[in-house]
């Protein structure tokens, strides 16, 4: 089976609608979310190929890859090892963000209305970043999180 489009997201379906299907999940780590062409296996050992158009920038948790009268195949994003930085104030955040930005690291930002309940910067785990956060006495925690967007390798040139 070759999948060439995303049909929607399971978040758009009610629990009653989902219950009408046998659901198989394709469990993907962060790095695989940005691969448009890949071979994957569902949790029921069904092998499928993905050949997604360039308009699809990344897969999201709950994306529907296949749907018929009885079967639903969806994406389940695996938790990512991340550092959640909780700035004490704007000055500290600016200094830390500037230092980490010089390393061309991808970061995701969340506000008080997010699941974090406060303003945070989330970075994919890296021991050198953790060392830096310790060195500047930043408030942070290391967590496993399902991220709403994939972390991408940052391309750059000077």
Curated annotation (Swiss-Prot):
UniProt entry keywords in alphabetical sequence: Chaperone, Cytoplasm, Nickel
Chain segments annotated as transmembrane: none
CDD domains with a match to the protein in the record: UreE (cd00571)
A molecular-function term among this protein's GO annotations: unfolded protein binding
Keyword check for Cytoplasm: yes
Main location: cytoplasm
Gene Ontology annotations for the cellular component aspect, listed alphabetically: cytoplasm
SMART domains in the record: UreE_N
Cell compartment(s), UniProt: Cytoplasm
Superkingdom of origin: Bacteria
Any Gene Ontology biological process: protein folding
Pfam families: UreE_C (PF05194), UreE_N (PF02814)
Keyword Cytoplasm annotated: yes
InterPro entries tied to this protein: UreE, UreE_C_dom, UreE_N, UreE_N_sf
Biological role: Involved in urease metallocenter assembly. Binds nickel. Probably functions as a nickel donor during metallocenter assembly.
Cross-referenced HAMAP family: UreE
Family: Belongs to the UreE family.
Protein name, as recorded: Urease accessory protein UreE
Protein source organism: Corynebacterium urealyticum (strain ATCC 43042 / DSM 7109)
């Amino acid at each position: 089976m070759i999948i060439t489009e995303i049909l929607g997201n399971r978040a758009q379906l009610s629990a009653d609608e989902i219950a009408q299907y046998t659901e198989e999940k394709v469990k993907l780590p962060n790095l695989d979310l940005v691969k448009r062409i890949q071979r994957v296996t569902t949790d029921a050992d069904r092998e499928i190929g993905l050949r997604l158009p360039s308009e699809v920038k990344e897969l999201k948790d709950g994306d529907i890859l296949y749907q018929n009268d009885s079967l639903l195949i969806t994406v389940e994003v695996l938790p990512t090892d991340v550092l959640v930085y909780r700035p004490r104030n704007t000055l500290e955040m600016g200094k830390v963000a500037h230092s980490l930005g010089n390393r061309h690291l991808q970061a995701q930002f969340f506000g008080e209305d997010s699941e974090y309940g406060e303003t945070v910067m989330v970075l994919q785990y890296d021991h050198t970043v953790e060392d830096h956060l310790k060195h500047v006495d930043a408030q942070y925690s290391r967590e496993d999180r399902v991220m709403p967007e994939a972390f991408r390798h940052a391309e750059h040139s000077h």
